[in-house]
Amino acid sequence: MRKLTTLLALSVFAATPFALHGEEVVALEKFVVTSQKRTEEIKDVPISVTAYKGEFLNRLGIGSFKDLAPYVPGLFIQEQSPNNPGINVRGVTTDSGNPSQETRVSIFQDGVSISRSRGSVVELFDLERVEVLKGPQGTLFGRGAQIGAISIIQNKAQNGTLGQFTAGFGNFGKIEASGTYNTVLAPNQLFARVAFSYVDREGSIENVADGSDLNGKNTLGVRTSLRWQPGTATTADFIINYQRDQPPGTAFKSGTFAPRGGNTRAFETAELNRGAELGIDRTVVGLTGIVTHDLNNAFTLTSITGYRDFDSFEAFDADGTRLNILEFAEDYLGEQLSQELRISYDTRGRFRGFAGLSYFDEKGSARVPFYTDERQLAAFLLRGSGVPVFNPDGTPNTGLTVSPITGGPLRAYNREEYTQTGATEAYDIFVDGTYNVTDRLELSAGFRSTFEDITSGYQVINALTPAGFPTGAANFPNTLFAPTNGLIQATRDYNSWVARAVARYKISSDISAFASASRGRRPDTLLISFVGGRYVPVELKEEIVWNYEVGLKGTMLQNRLNWSAAVFKYDYANFQSTAVNPTPPPLTTTVDAGNATGEGFELTFQGVLNPAVTTFGTFGYTDATFDDVNDRGQRQQLAGNTFRLTSRRTYSFGATFSGSFGPAGRIQLTPSYQYKSKHFFDDNNANAGGILSQDGFGLFNVRAAFQPKGDRWEVVAYIDNLFDKEYIIDAGNTGGAFGIPTFIAGDPRLFGVRATYRF
């Protein structure tokens, strides 16, 4: 920690986007955020927060979380598909599809939690800004913000008539279109806004099984919003968000068995069963109502009401081969209702703060069907005994027709499934305040208490016919899943608290320092597990994290450069990890991996060198590992292992060069570079011989824009991953539990052109 503090004291960086208002102005525009539930300049916020305006996102072509992550130190996004993201802040990942498990990183869309994994991926379009807060944020944001929060603030309807339309195309058959239109329905009182985004792109991996493609994209997002201002004291916003995702299948490619005529490299052709039937069909609908009312000059009442409904079906080939042995799907249904009431106090005096109540109700289910050809599965499981998996011509071996275990027939098709269910009802009470001790020193403190009722359920639907090759005696009559004989449920009540304490000191008019301590918490995990030959409720203790950090923020060079730096250290207790179950079923299980520690530092800068050149950069260092021993002094199973999806070093930088293109207009060139050091895809870094990892790599992107005079038109040409760098975004997966890990390739070189017309 001392070394990191020294580095902090020697560093100068930046944290906010810029804007230029004509060539005569060479300075950064003030950037206001609401990270602390009040409007304030980002340089005055004593939190490690990185925020970007919508204009910056558009300039760099950022339309998704995975595009955003490289420009936020401490943020790592793995997006296998819209149905299966992994969101990592400072080394801690949230990606569980179990509807009874809470997230570690919260995502909020206009103040409403959208954190549940299967419904959290949304397109980033027509945004006012995005704020990414690192460290425990439960006091400010509530559920799921154990180690960080992503806050999306969408553009609301405004008093005016304006719009724009964008259309473009690119390689891999890409077609895209987006647009916004804002209008006035009643002068000075009622306004409406509509925005949409559509992207369709073929997959970059060919599936030679039927000529279909994998790793593509097909997403439509639509948003409508109304704003009503009946008077100067009241503003009411009503927002409807809709998103439909129908991409082709994910390229889970086997690293063990090559496709016919190919190899096991993740970046080349795959041969997956079901062909074009693989893929995702996901629909997300969200309704949001926000009302703010100034009670008087001191108090403001805010109400945020949210409703979300989403369903997502994904069919995937878990073995990553032409073998018909591990054919899975996931059918997820989720519904949630939330309400927050908050009263804020601010007279521009020494004290300001807020207090409130919130309610959250959520229900979800994840149904997982499993299909297999028992003849092929038997050959695969007996391969160590000399049974060939494939025939000499490369076709799967279906010669085993009688089970060596049961003596019964082995069938060409058998199906079984399980369903996990979860329900949460929670009530929060919270308070947070800031007191200016002097003109230079301010102290902040916050507290949130949560009362929650959690229900977890599990049910197995037995095989169509008794399994010919059960993988364990307890599983019969099924192949993989031990029967439950109906739905098994358990309910528990929990009470908890989180808090923060912060001190901010204004060193000068341009520089301030802060120090904070905060407590984060992930609720107890309630599982239905198979123990001792029967299903029983199993509780894993709540995860607790204590986070400590110090930071500096400021501006320099006459407000031409913004910079920020922070050093952090956190201590985890009862850190939960996913591991292969030594006594299945199930194949994998959630375990208490004990204690863990993380430390690091984060740096950002952004500035304007002159009217023609602007620049930005970020750097992050994260050392997050499992401790050697637990609280009892016993050596931990994962001692010394690095958290999954955690690069020790990440950085990004770029610049925008602007200039006149004669009388025709202006041109802009924006090159950018992003780098991630080596990271693992499993908390057990040695799993599968340590091959479940990605070495350090960098991606170079470039954008060129032409703006004719009048600023109505803009044409942009772009290339992402200019040098066509090969890298993987995940490894292991379900196939890894059977000793045949699969690998997913990242995007290759993508390029295209888009044109925008503003009116």
Q: What residue ranges belong to the model's regions?
A:
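Solvent-exposed loop segments that connect transmembrane elements
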Residues: 205-213, 250-273, 317-327, 369-419, ...
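Membrane-embedded beta-barrel scaffold of Gram-negative outer-membrane proteins
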Residues: 286, 290-294, 298-316, 506-522, ...
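Outer-membrane beta-barrel domain signature, strongest for Gram-negative TonB-dependent receptors
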Residues: 211, 217-354, 360-366, 562-563
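Conserved C-terminal beta-signal and adjacent last beta-strands/turns
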Residues: 6, 20, 332-358, 515, ...
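Structural signature of Gram-negative outer-membrane beta-barrels, strongest in the C-terminal barrel
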Residues: 227-231, 344-346, 358-360, 422-570, ...
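Acidic, small-polar-rich N-terminal luminal/periplasmic segments of exported/outer-membrane proteins
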Residues: 26-160, 550
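Outer-membrane beta-barrel translocator/receptor signature
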Residues: 102-104, 116, 125-134, 139-208, ...
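Gram-negative outer-membrane beta-barrel transporters
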Residues: 354, 436-443, 564-571, 591-683, ...
